Amino acid sequence: MEKRTSCSVQTSTNCDNSLEILNSAHQATGAVQMRIKNANSHQDRQSQTKSMILTDAGKVTEPISRHRRNHSQHVLKDVIPPLEHPMVEKEGYLQKAKIADGGKKLRKNWSTSWIVLSGRKIEFYKDSKQQALPNMKTRHNVESVDLCGAHIEWAKEKSSRKSVFQITTVSGNEFLLQSDIDFLILDWFQAIKNAIDRLPKNPSCGSLELFNLQRSSSSELPSHCHIDRKEQKPEHRKSFMFRLHHSASDTSDKNRVKSRLKKFISRRPSLKTLQEKGLIKDQIFGSHLHTVCEREHSTVPWFVKQCIEAVEKRGLDVDGIYRVSGNLATIQKLRFIVNQEEKLNLDDSQWEDIHVVTGALKMFFRELSEPLFPYSFFERFVEAIKKQDSNEKIETMRSLVKRLPPPNHDTMKILFRHLTKIVAKASQNLMSTQSLGIVFGPTLLRAENESGNVAVHMVYQNQIAEFMLTEYDKIFSSEED
């Protein structure tokens, strides 16, 4: 019995030893298999490492990670080494208005923007916080301006605001930037001008294709870059990336683009042809009086007649007529409608403030490319007003008026006749001949080149307008109404 028990114990012990040996062998086998598997994985990684992309001589990109789940997660920086991000040269808040998009005029809409100047571009953000956001969807809405080939200039005539300059890009986009702080806007103007001057004047400067790829808001490769990395040979990848990197500077491509541009420019119709067909029309405001009258087949602009008629209908007895300013935004709206040659009814409720109508009329005369009193007549009218004898002064004035071009003569006559009706009701509107002379003198006549005698000229301008108004009947007495 004891011997059987001993055998059983020995057998059990042997079994346990056998199990331990088997387990050890199994573990050893598993470890070997794991090492083999790891070795295979390492070899697989080595095979992937061999298919690297050569961009520049002696430089090798990082191997493509195997931990990405699909090709869409392989971002551009895994294939193309990122270009150096240009250093931020200047940033801050300015007032911005986009007035043209691709050559198409836009309504001016001012807004405060956080502006960043870096390298060859300007970026407009809603505020400084948006610039710091890494979210691609947020940054996708950022407006960027390529300064290569752009033009910058001061634009006083584009806005009633002070210190405004304009940036025009080669793509036809136009932006106005403004600040009430003089030294700040001057600093911005000089910084942007310096950035433009550093860039080539050729719009195709630099490697545009690669530059656009880097600026793209998408984190994925372009569609033509979605290729099977296992099947593509290394030399094919190298060749593809070489073409991508150097395509913008390829001589044959440049010659082909130049040839197409030359053909396009040579076939483009002239400005005169477009104007004759009515596709391009000069604006009413800011044009030459002769041009406006010639287009309307008249010697007095239609807009001038409309304004005078409206004022005489409902504004002769309004206090401060022509002296009080109307709402500038409404005046600009009226100006826009006139320039677009849309239907205009000054009896409409939106023009019920008569000061808006008078303000628009004064703006029309003020913005003429040549004043109502032509530049060539300015000195002659000044010499006439200096004469001491009143009769001699009237005769000289009458002689000068007769020699004016028909559009200037007829428009001047209808305007001063209208102003005499304003003076006739001076007891109600409180506008004397002297007041109207001060208002219309600098508007209707000025020297072509102001040489420092601005104050002296202003005195003569007021006196000439006042004298023409006072002696209207005698100056135009020999003419039929």
Curated annotation (Swiss-Prot):
GO terms for cellular component: cytoplasm; nucleoplasm; plasma membrane. The keyword Cytoplasm applies. The modification Phosphoserine is found at residues 51, 111, 204, 207, 249. Keywords: Cytoplasm, GTPase activation, Membrane, Phosphoprotein. Its main location: cytoplasm. PANTHER family: RHO GTPASE-ACTIVATING PROTEIN 15, RHO/RAC/CDC GTPASE-ACTIVATING PROTEIN. This is Rho GTPase-activating protein 15.
